[in-house]
């Protein structure tokens, strides 16, 4: 089955089955199952197409362990954790494995040859062969040992792993991983005490898992997988902590599917049972192909196979006497009914594919299916002459009977009857007469005694209470039906139709003949071969169905053909009795020899290798050097049929037998079968567990894990429990967190909705849901609803219901909200009229919600009369009494009222408030907690006992060192000095670029090339619509975008490298320009060559760009290396710790790791902060300390990049930025910030000490203030104002633009804050004067942040981190030119500055203190901090038609001598002046304004920077245009 296509198709047809995992907003699961080969694929196939990047086995093992732990921490299973690696597969699967591995080896060899031809540097040593992921290889044996070590480590050290049952099925246990999982679930389900509402989650990438999950009939079942993207693949792979994961909920899939079949429920001839329909659907889907059988011809998902299968299956259900799938056994007779309907699809394909289609349509239109469809579209019938004549004789009689209503109580002999002519050949016309009579409300009677047929009025079909109007409508309908028959297409006689049918059938047989001849090398003349082929395929359907429902029926059976029979021939294989011989699986080495190509011979034992390459080998023909591929109607290369021979089992075993004695003892062990293993925690066990990888993993000094064999007894088919078990909860009664459509009423229909689930609108039908507004139906007013639910919990985010607190309700005219106040009169429910802004927000939300629900979810919510504002629940926090209360997000969500659910059947236990629990239960004796006191904030603490029922006795550990290392903060300051940011209007002014052009060229600037394709020729450093930036190149604060000196250099490089193109691009308007219009005098070839050079240059420029959210930031690569170097020395010199015992400690002075998630998520972090990991579960040992080197927002959570003091098993090197594996990205809720101590608890003693310190500081401040005289303050203020006016007048005189307008002090607003004025330094032109002019910035108007959220806090942290300081040189050396970019290397290219991360460090900036070698860019965890060098110029390939002046030199801020301090309050005229200069100083040439003076750039100082701003009209227009470009 085409995995991505099937997943995409069902996701677009049933749009809401996918749920993005966001923190804890997913259901709880009892059991988690891992199809481990999906993980192996992700961890080893990351760079399949790039032979220049290689992974060592040690790196692969570490990545696999990290991936497993990440999935465990994501789902957090409560009972069972089952890991299954593919063992030896059944022969039915082995043929597919053989084809795939031969194809993989061929592709790898081609990729290597291509890289060598391109001159790419190939790493030394053998590359990792992905074919080693096959049972029996050395790699798999090592993997098993490493995974066993990993399990022992996690159970010994991780509390969460100890609480569940761990079962591991390695490669030495026969069977595919996914089917081992299904066998395990079958055993669970068949136990008498099995809970039918067990919550299952399977991780895996195979689409077959969807069918396997459905076959269990478990409603609480979900599939976990990574985010799927379609279209062009991104070369940069996300790090694990930034990888999005989705849950595909089978509960919703089941409900959507039931909507598909509800239309036939009342028409079926037997009892409707959705669970049985589901079983039949699974069988039906086998014919589009799977791992064991090829798809039936022309049945391709991307060519409309799915709706065909559904529709033909529905038709078959209406015309058969029961279900096809009888608990895993196929009812072949009923299967034949469905195949008969499916054959109509084949006839349609034949009619489309016939060579002479035009002749076919004209000559055979009367009997072809396509001709019948055309007649149906225009309402035409096809009749022979005699049939039309017969209608003419019936019509007068019928019209006479319809002159008046007939009584429904007429005796039978009085019912109007018309005897048909006796000479009528009823054999030829009986079927036609039946259809005609049914359409006209008649029925046919036959008198055997008279030998005649008659038409009789069907009075039973007439409503006995029919009104006169209804009678007339019936008469008119009959008249129209007769007219349709009389206007039919007429054929002379039946012989003519028979002749056409004969021609049709002959051409159809010829069409099938060509298929069998081309694909299977025999023809339809070989009737026996066609029948054998059909029997093999039907046998295969039964094998697969047994495999799904009962387990492997035969290890040796396989389908011995590469292609399937034609659908119409499949019925020839139904007449058989199907039995299977169980046999036994291949040994691991037999499978290796059966599936591996000769190119992978190093993966098998040396003794067997000659059998592959020796020409005298009896099985040499099993290993061809090349294999043919046949796409067979598919579009993707990987879907092609690999035409490789099938392995003869007998020949293979006989050839290997003589070499078995040459195997080493280790190889003999690898060739044996093993057992599943079960692991458990036993505190009494305490021993040493040796590490299989001493250089990567350390020994487990205190191993508390017990390992045993896990043995299950195979089930007989009679012991298996099929279908949905009794008392399983469905629909609105499902367990908390599991989604259901049925919590709201709706109607459904299939529509071409262009649903946008992925990146493009769907071309297929989607199930569209029309919501019924129950509140409107029940006449519930907004006031009634508000009084009942305001400030209380309701449920939103349907169908994924989540608890939320209703805070307000509005219809756009009136707002209903809850008011809290100490005044009882003002407390409670209130109403107020909506203001203008409220009305705008309401209309905006209304329009966006209608559009979003309709297009993304295929939900039509109807008229939106009210919108609910809610705060979603985030968790529980402990109050001062020890009880737990709900916490809600401070960020509001908005939902249409009709999608709000008032209550649910099963509440989520995770969010139930509870009172205080006994202190000894909350803090068990000897348990570990975190100390929050001033003495050792974040220190490891042990519970020793209880002073009272509310106070603790504890022992706190504190390191001997007095303070935490500050290297992170020190390096942060250095980074701030290296990279300076400038507001967009300053960059625009300095580079003489229009603001709108600057905005587009630094984001997405689309042009149309000669082929009509849209090409982005912008440097993508900012993404307004996506709320993202490129780290180190751009940032956004509340007042607009700012660019770093690195971006300025790129823009200059762009203009210098492609001056003519840059100039012409700067002159276009808002429309997307066409390349030919930009260069009308240039040949298309030369213009396209130029564009190719630009594309290569831009690709090189942006190859290491890291797009992150606006709230993200990181230290540079050099600084991270310096922090690591310092921390390694620091950690090595820590000399022990001291312990202090404390008594009468209140609960709030300690933090319980198991219940602190919601509290810790509210923390703020900054670069350089010291943190401590405080969870007793996860990837890091509890109480591990580290330094924050980066952070980014992930959806609604905050991910912190931490460089830990010690190496950790699950750690990484941040993509090469670290020398050791001590880096990791973690959710903020796992960490406690010990630099910014936000939860510190002060005892009475510490409070007194703190108060004394404050008093001392106040006295010092008062002393300093007393020395200042008011007169001096006034004189300084006067001087600042005078200098500001001098500066403004000076600039005006300098440009000959005299303007007497006074400075408007009020235009910038006033600053009521009492904080000292911010200072910004500007430099006056040296040739005029060196006098410093000082202007106060106290009255700068701050733009408030929109949301008081964690993201907003981090935004502040990012924006404020660049403090005022010395600027850096803007001229950064150019790195060497890549070999594949037009233009070649340039002189002096080796003089490159040290590569920083994620940007270059300018000359003079301090590099690594120990003189480490330059760090090369690598792939790394998000945000990726790769070195980003400025690329070299590339010639455009043809002459420059217009002279282009060189750009003006940039001001070197670092060389500024005297500095000008600008008063922002006095600078509004300066802003107006700059704006006027931008627009009125004449036309521009090549992006440079005529008559303009060379500009200077002043660095920005973060969010609160005080540089002048261009008028809002310019910046807003630029941002709007940029946003529009991004959405194009």
Curated annotation (Swiss-Prot):
Q: How is activity regulated here?
A: 3'-phosphoadenosine 5'-phosphate (pAp) is an inhibitor of KEM1. Sodium-induced GCN4 expression reduces pAp accumulation by activating HAL2 expression, and therefore maintains mRNA degradation capacity which is likely to be important for the accurate and rapid adaptation of gene expression to salt stress.
Q: Which Pfam families match?
A: SH3_12 (PF18129), XRN1_D1 (PF18332), XRN1_D2_D3 (PF18334), XRN_M (PF17846), XRN_N (PF03159)
* Phosphoserine modification, residue list: 1510
Q: Which residue ranges are recorded for the region named Disordered?
A: 1246-1331, 1431-1455, 1470-1528
Taxonomy, superkingdom: Eukaryota
Q: Where is the composition biased (Basic residues)?
A: 1317-1326
**Subcellular localization, per the record?**
Cytoplasm; Cytoplasm, Perinuclear region; Cytoplasm, P-body
Q: What happens when the gene is disrupted?
A: Mutations affect nuclear fusion, lead to reduced chromosome stability and defects in spindle pole body duplication and/or separation as well as loss of viability under conditions of nitrogen starvation. Homozygous diploids are unable to sporulate. Mutations also lead to arrest in pachytene and deficiency in meiotic recombination and sensitivity to oleate.
Q: How is the cofactor bound?
A: Both strand exchange and nuclease activities require magnesium, for the strand exchange activity, calcium can replace magnesium when the linear ds-DNA has been first resected with an exogenous endonuclease.
The residue ranges flagged as biased composition, category Basic and acidic residues, are: 1274-1304, 1518-1528
E.C. number, please? 3.1.13.-
Summarizing the annotation, the consequence of altering residue 37 to D is: Strongly reduces exonuclease activity
Listed result of changing residue 592 to P: Strongly reduces exonuclease activity
**GO CC term (a single one):** cytoplasm
According to its UniProt record, this protein's enzyme class is: hydrolase
BP term (GO), one: traversing start control point of mitotic cell cycle
Provide the effect of residue 1024 to D: Strongly reduces exonuclease activity
- Mark the residues carrying the PTM Phosphothreonine: 1506
Query: Impact of altering residue 710 to C?
Result: Strongly reduces exonuclease activity
The entry's other comment says: Present with 11700 molecules/cell in log phase SD medium.
**Biological function:** Multifunctional protein that exhibits several independent functions at different levels of the cellular processes. 5'-3' exonuclease component of the nonsense-mediated mRNA decay (NMD) which is a highly conserved mRNA degradation pathway, an RNA surveillance system whose role is to identify and rid cells of mRNA with premature termination codons and thus prevents accumulation of potentially harmful truncated proteins. The NMD pathway has a second role regulating the decay of wild-type mRNAs, and especially mRNAs that are important for telomere functions.
Q: What is this protein called?
A: 5'-3' exoribonuclease 1
Q: Which organism is it from?
A: Saccharomyces cerevisiae (strain ATCC 204508 / S288c)
| Gene that this polypeptide is encoded by | XRN1
């Amino acid at each position: 089955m085409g995995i991505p296509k099937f997943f995409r198709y069902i996701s677009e047809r049933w749009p809401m089955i996918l749920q993005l995992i966001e923190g804890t907003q997913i259901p709880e699961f009892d059991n988690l199952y891992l199809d481990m080969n999906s993980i192996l694929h992700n961890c080893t196939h990351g760079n399949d197409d790039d032979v220049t990047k290689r992974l060592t086995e040690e790196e692969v093992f570490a990545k696999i362990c990290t991936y497993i732990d990440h999935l465990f921490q994501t789902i957090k299973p409560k009972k069972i954790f089952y890991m299954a690696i593919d063992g030896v597969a059944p022969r039915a699967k082995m043929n597919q494995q053989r084809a795939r591995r031969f194809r993989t080896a061929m592709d790898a060899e081609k990729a290597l040859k291509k890289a060598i031809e391109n001159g790419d540097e190939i790493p030394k040593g053998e590359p990792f062969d992905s074919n080693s992921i096959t049972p029996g290889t050395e790699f798999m044996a090592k993997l098993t040992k490493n995974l066993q070590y990993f399990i022992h480590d996690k159970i010994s050290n991780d509390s969460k792993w100890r609480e569940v049952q761990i079962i591991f099925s390695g490669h030495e246990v026969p069977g595919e991983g996914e089917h081992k999982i299904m066998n395990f679930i079958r055993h669970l389900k068949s136990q008498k005490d099995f809970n039918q509402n067990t919550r299952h989650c399977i991780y895996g990438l195979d689409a077959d898992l969807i069918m396997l999950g459905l076959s269990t009939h478990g409603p609480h079942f979900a599939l976990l997988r990574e985010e799927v993207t379609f279209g062009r693949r991104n070369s940069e792979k996300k790090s694990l902590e930034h990888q999005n994961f989705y849950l595909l909920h089978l509960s919703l899939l089941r409900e959507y599917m039931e909507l598909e079949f509800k239309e036939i429920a009342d028409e079926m001839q037997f009892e409707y049972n959705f669970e049985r329909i589901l079983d039949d659907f699974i069988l039906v889907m086998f014919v589009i192909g799977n791992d064991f059988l090829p798809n039936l011809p022309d049945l391709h998902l991307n060519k409309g196979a799915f709706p065909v299968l559904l529709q033909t299956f529905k038709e078959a259900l209406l015309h058969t006497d029961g279900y096809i799938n009888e608990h895993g056994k196929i009812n072949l007779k009923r299967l034949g009914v469905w195949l008969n309907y499916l054959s109509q699809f084949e006839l349609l394909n034949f009619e489309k594919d016939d060579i002479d289609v035009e002749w076919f349509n004209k000559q055979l239109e009367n009997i072809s299916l396509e001709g019948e469809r055309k007649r149906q579209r225009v309402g035409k019938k096809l009749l022979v002459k005699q049939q039309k004549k017969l209608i003419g004789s019936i019509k007068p009689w019928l019209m006479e009977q319809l002159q008046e209503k007939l009584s429904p109580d007429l005796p039978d002999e009085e019912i109007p009857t018309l005897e048909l002519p006796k000479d009528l050949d009823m054999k030829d016309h009986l079927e036609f007469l039946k259809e005609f009579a049914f359409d006209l409300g008649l029925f046919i009677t036959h008198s055997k005694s008279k030998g005649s047929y008659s038409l009789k009025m069907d009075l039973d079909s007439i409503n006995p209470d029919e009104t006169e109007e209804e009678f007339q409508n019936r008469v008119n309908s009959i008249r129209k039906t007769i007219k349709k028959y009389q206007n039919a297409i007429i054929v002379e006689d039946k012989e003519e139709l028979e002749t056409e049918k004969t021609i049709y059938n002959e051409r159809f047989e010829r069409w099938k003949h060509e298929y069998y001849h081309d694909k299977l090398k025999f023809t339809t003349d070989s009737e026996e071969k066609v029948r054998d082929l059909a029997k093999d395929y039907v046998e295969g359907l039964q094998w697969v169905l047994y495999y799904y429902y009962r387990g492997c029926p035969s290890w040796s059976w396989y389908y011995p053909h590469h292609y399937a029979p034609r659908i119409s021939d499949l019925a020839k294989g139904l007449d058989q009795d199907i039995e299977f011989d169980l046999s036994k699986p291949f040994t691991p080495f037999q499978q290796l020899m059966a599936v591996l190509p000769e190119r992978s011979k190093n993966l098998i034992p040396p003794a067997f290798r000659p059998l592959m390459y020796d020409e005298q080998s009896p099985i040499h023909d099993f290993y061809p050097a090349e294999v043919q591929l046949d796409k067979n109607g598919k579009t993707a290369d990987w879907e092609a049929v690999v035409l490789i021979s099938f392995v003869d089992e007998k020949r293979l075993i006989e050839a290997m037998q003589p070499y078995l004695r040459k195997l080493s003892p280790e190889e003999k062990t690898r060739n044996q079968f093993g057992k599943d293993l079960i692991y458990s925690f036993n505190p009494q066990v305490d021993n040493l567990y040796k590490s299989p990888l001493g250089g990567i993993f350390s020994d487990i000094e205190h191993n508390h894990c017990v390992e045993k064999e896990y043995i299950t007894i195979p089930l007989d088919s009679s012991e298996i429990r099929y279908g949905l078990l009794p008392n399983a909860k469905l629909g609105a009664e499902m367990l908390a967190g599991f989604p259901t459509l049925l919590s709201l009423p709706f109607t459904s229909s299939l529509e071409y909705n262009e649903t946008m689930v992925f990146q493009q609108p769907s071309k297929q039908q989607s199930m569209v849901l029309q919501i019924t507004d129950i509140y409107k139906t029940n006449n519930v007013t907004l006031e009634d609803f508000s009084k009942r639910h305001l400030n209380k919990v309701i449920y939103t985010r349907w169908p994924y219901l989540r608890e939320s607190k209703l805070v307000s309700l509005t219809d756009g005219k009136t707002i209903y909200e809850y008011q809290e106040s100490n005044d009882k009169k003002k407390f409670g429910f209130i109403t107020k009229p909506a203001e203008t802004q409220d009305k705008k927000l309401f209309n905006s939300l209304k329009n966006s919600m209608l559009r979003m629900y309709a297009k993304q979810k295929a939900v039509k919510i109807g008229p939106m009369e009210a919108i609910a504002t809610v705060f979603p629940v985030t968790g529980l926090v402990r109050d001062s009494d020890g009880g737990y209360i709900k916490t809600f997000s401070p960020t509001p969500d908005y939902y249409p009222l009709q999608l709000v659910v008032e209550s649910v059947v099963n509440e989520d236990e995770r969010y139930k408030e509870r009172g205080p629990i006994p202190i000894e239960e909350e803090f068990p004796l000897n348990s570990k907690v975190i100390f929050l006191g001033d003495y050792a904030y974040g220190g490891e603490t042990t519970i020793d006992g209880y002073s009272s029922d509310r106070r603790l006795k504890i022992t706190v550990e504190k390191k001997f060192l007095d303070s935490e290392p500050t290297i992170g903060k020190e390096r942060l300051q250095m980074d701030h000095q290296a990279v300076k940011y400038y507001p967009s209007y300053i960059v625009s002014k300095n580079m003489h670029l229009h603001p709108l052009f600057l905005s587009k060229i630094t984001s997405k600037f689309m042009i149309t090339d000669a082929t009509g394709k849209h090409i982005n020729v912008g440097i993508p450093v900012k993404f307004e619509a996506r709320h993202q930036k490129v780290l180190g190149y751009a940032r956004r604060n509340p007042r607009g975008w700012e660019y770093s000196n690195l971006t300025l250099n790129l823009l200059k490089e762009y203009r210098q490298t492609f001056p003519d193109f840059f100039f012409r691009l700067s002159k276009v308007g808002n429309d997307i320009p066409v390349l030919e219009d930009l260069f009308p005098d240039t040949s298309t070839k030369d213009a396209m060559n130029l564009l190719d050079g630009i594309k290569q240059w831009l690709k090189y420029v942006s190859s290491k760009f890291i797009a992150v959210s606006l709230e993200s930031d990181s230290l540079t690569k050099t600084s991270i290396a310096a922090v690591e170097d310092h921390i390694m020395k620091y950690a090595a010199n820590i000399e022990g710790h001291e312990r202090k015992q404390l008594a009468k400690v209140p609960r709030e002075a300690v933090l319980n790791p198991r219940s602190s998630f919601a509290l810790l998520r509210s923390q703020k972090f900054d670069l350089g902060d010291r943190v401590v990991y405080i969870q007793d579960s996860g990837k890091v040992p509890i109480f591990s300390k580290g330094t924050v080197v980066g952070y980014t927002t992930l959806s609604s959570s905050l991910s912190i990049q931490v460089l830990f003091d010690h190496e950790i098993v699950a750690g990484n090197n941040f993509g090469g930025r670290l020398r050791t594996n001590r880096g990791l990205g973690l959710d903020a809720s796992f960490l406690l910030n010990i630099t910014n101590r936000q939860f510190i608890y002060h005892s009475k003693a510490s409070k007194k000490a703190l108060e004394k310190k404050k008093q001392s500081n106040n006295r010092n401040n008062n002393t300093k203030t007393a020395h200042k005289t008011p007169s001096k303050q006034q004189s300084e203020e006067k001087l600042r104002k005078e200098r500001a006016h001098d500066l403004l007048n000076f600039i005006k005189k300098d440009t000959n633009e005299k303007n007497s307008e006074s400075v408007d002090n009020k235009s910038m607003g006033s600053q009521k804050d009492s904080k000292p004025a911010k200072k910004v330094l500007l430099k006056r032109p040296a040739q005029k004067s060196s006098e410093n002019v000082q202007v106060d910035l106290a009255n700068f108007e701050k733009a408030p942040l929109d949301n008081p959220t964690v993201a907003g806090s981090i935004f502040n942290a990012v924006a404020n981190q660049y403090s005022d300081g010395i600027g850096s040189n803007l001229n950064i050396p150019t790195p060497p030119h890549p070999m594949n970019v037009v233009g070649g290397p340039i002189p002096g290219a080796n003089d490159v500055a040290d590569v920083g991360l994620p940007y270059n460090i300018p000359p003079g900036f301090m590099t690594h203190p120990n003189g480490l070698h330059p760090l090369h860019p690598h792939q790394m965890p998000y945000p990726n901090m790769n070195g980003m060098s400025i690329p070299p110029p590339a010639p455009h390939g043809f002459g420059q038609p217009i002279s282009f002046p060189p750009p003006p030199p940039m001001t070197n801020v670092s060389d500024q001598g005297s500095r000008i301090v600008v008063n922002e309050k006095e600078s509004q005229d300066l802003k107006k002046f700059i704006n006027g200069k931008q627009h009125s100083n004449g036309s521009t040439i090549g992006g440079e304004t005529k008559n303009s003076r060379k500009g200077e750039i002043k660095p920005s100082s973060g969010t609160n920077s005080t540089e002048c701003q261009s008028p809002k009209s310019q910046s807003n227009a630029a941002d709007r245009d940029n946003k529009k470009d991004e959405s194009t």
